Amino acid sequence: MPRRVRAQKRTAGVVEDEEVKAEQVRREHKAKQKQAVGSDAEQEEEELFPDSLHGPDSESDVTDDEQIDEEARQADRDLLKELVTLQGLNGEDPSDADNDDDDDEEEAASDDDDEEEDAEPSSDSSNEASDAGQEEGTTDPHTTTDDKASATTQMVVYSSDDDTSDEEHSLNRVGRIPMEWYEDYEHIGYDLNGKRIRKPKQKDRLEKFLDAFEAGNNGRTIYDPVTGKEIELTDDDINMIKRIQSGQLPDTGINPYEDYVDFFTHEKMQTPVVDKPEPKRRFVPSKWEHKKIMKIVRSIRKGLIKLPTSDDEKDKSSEEEQYYDVWGNEDDPNDPRIKVRQANHIAAPKVALPHHAESYNPPEEYLPTDAEAEKWRNAHEDDRERNYLPHKYGSLRLVPAYDQYIQERFHRCLDLYLCPRARRIRMNVDPEDLLPKLPKPEDLQPFPSAPSLVYRGHKARVTSISCDPTGQWLVSGSDDKTIRVWEISTGRCVRVVTVDAEVNMVAWCPNAGVSIVAVAHGHTVSLICPRVATAAIDKATAVLCNQSIEKPSQGAEEGMRATPTWNRIRGERQDQDGIFFEIPHHAEVMQVTWHHKGNYFASVMPRAETQSVCVHSLNRQSTQHPFQKRNRDVQRVLFHPTQPLFFVATKTHVRVYNLQAQALVKKLLTGVRWLSSLAIHPAGDNLIIGSYDKRLCWFDMDLSIKPYKILRYHKYALRQVCFHKKYPIFASCGDDGNVHVLHGMVYNDLGQNPLIVPVKIIKAHNQTSDGMGVMDCTFHPSQPWLFSAGSDGSIKLHV
């Protein structure tokens, strides 16, 4: 017989003997405890089942009861030691068996004698252990045929109340706690006997690498922080991990989509599905109901609850039989309540009389045309003037039933009982008194009111105009890819420059010492010298543009676009057209605007994914991108006239940034859907915006982030708004072909609100077939004159 089987049998017999001894000690101790007076259940339970992991007390003087407890605990410890020994035999390494071959030969004779003596106890104990294991249900399904004897013993060793515990097969008994608590100690926990488990030697990366090649496990080894050992995963574990990673169930034997069987609506069965015995509480009177009833009985005895008598029941029945007619005195004219009600009665409003269009044979002028009928059908119910279409019938008998009759009666009933009626005293107030007292427009002159000159020459719509600081010249850009310079006083075109794309905007440099025009066309911004100023100004402009500046290497950072390069134009284009620089951009440029000192100008690319705003330095001939985040909503930008503030207008908001602090100062809430234009007062405290939804908003930035005034006087979208630099007037133009001139006085007193008065509506240009009207407008720098650019290709001066 193999040594392992013999050892298992001997150990099983020892285990059985130790169990019998422990049971006898417990019975004796229990008998003595029953004789003791004043013992409670909790103390008896604690003494019967002591903690086997702790050693006995070190006290020398013990009583008889404590001696019995000590014997019981010693028996439990001996039993646990044998179980640990048995576990070591079951999990021993085959190499240990090979090393102990000599010991097996020496102990062969003694083993045979032990087998004869322990044959019956071993068989009995093994049978009892197997029966106990079957009752507990702790048999390992992976046990092989060679380990049948050890499996029966293991069922005794690992019997536990919690079959799902992860510590049953682990030597470390610290429980489910974070193992980080043992990082600063030399041990990682405690074994079954309460002894410390020292940390194994940690391998470095080289040793782990060599072990992986020597073992040949293909990276299947994982580290167990509870035991401090490396565990090799089996094929079943690898397959389970792969199934979990792919979102499947870990166990392949589980079918999550089994056919549903309805036990209670299927065929009738002979035996019930659930037939548990009735619990005892179904046959025993409820203790809690008894307490509630006794509480009510005590309240009745104390007089807190009074039971109804027979007289009370008669009175109650007589009261229930009495009825009251709420409408019985409605016909009594002497009732004072009826008189008050009739005096305060308000008659219901009468139904509106039918109109001529509701006739079955209306006149011809009341019958809608096909276009009007189609427009009525496409309109919303709330937008329709009437809820029916007039029809003409030859006779009354041909008129069909009115399909809106029930709906109208229903709304009439709602109006009668849901709408409250009240008497209101009509106030005799003149509507003119409700309007604010505004000064007369004649008292607010000067302002432009009449057309003076017409500048013709462009073959397509004029998109932008700008006046030079001296007020002598006017530059315009058009969709015909030309830039024209006009003399304001005579209307003569003195220079024409042709570019390679449609011109979106032109802006004259506000510095009177140089003569430079920034032109946005296509993906390029060009700097042009018109050469219409004096010789000294043209020379200063040439010196500024031709100066050589050492530039750093321009490269793109990671994830960003490269900085635009300033391409210097030389030769014939510079001599004839006056183009000094061309700055290419990565998207179409829709706006250019200058700083009030003329050293910087900004360009806007609304369709760019990133870096939609560029700030260019004329003196340094360089470009910066102040905003790196993705923003495709930027429509307009503007420099503050006196402070280092930068306005960035998106479709619905206006953000104000401080260029020195590089921080957001405030965010203005416009309330519009799509912003189109932006202008700031020369003092810098007030701002106006125009939008494509026909609104003009005036912002007092010292007052609030919301509009101070919202003006809705344009019939179509607004294209441009502008302030005069000297006079308290501002203007707006739109696709309706009109230019509105308004008086806007800003007072130095911060406690007084700005005064806004409409003074003139100028019919400047005709609306073209594409729905465009006035594209741009600007004021003369020193005179109360207004220039307007129309989609009809003309430019007009209003004085």
Curated annotation (Swiss-Prot):
In terms of Pfam families, this protein maps to: BOP1NT (PF08145), WD40 (PF00400)
Q: Which GO terms describe its molecular function?
A: ribonucleoprotein complex binding
Q: Where is the composition biased (Low complexity)?
A: 122-132
Q: Tell me the segments the record calls region Disordered.
A: 1-171
Q: One GO cellular component from the entry? A: PeBoW complex
Which GO BP annotation is one of this protein's?
A: maturation of LSU-rRNA from tricistronic rRNA transcript (SSU-rRNA, 5.8S rRNA, LSU-rRNA)
Q: Where are the WD repeats?
A: 457-498, 500-538, 584-626, 629-669, 670-709, 713-752, 769-799
Instruction: State if Mitochondrion is listed as a keyword.
Output: no
Q: Where in the cell is it found?
A: Nucleus, Nucleolus; Nucleus, Nucleoplasm
Record field: compositional bias (Basic and acidic residues): 70-81
Q: What is its main location?
A: nucleus
Stored PANTHER family:
RIBOSOME BIOGENESIS PROTEIN BOP1, RIBOSOME BIOGENESIS PROTEIN BOP1 BLOCK OF PROLIFERATION 1 PROTEIN
In which family does this protein belong, per the annotation? Belongs to the WD repeat BOP1/ERB1 family.
Function (record text): Required for maturation of ribosomal RNAs and formation of the large ribosomal subunit.
What this protein is called in its record is Ribosome biogenesis protein BOP1 homolog
Q: Which organism is it from?
A: Monosiga brevicollis (Choanoflagellate)
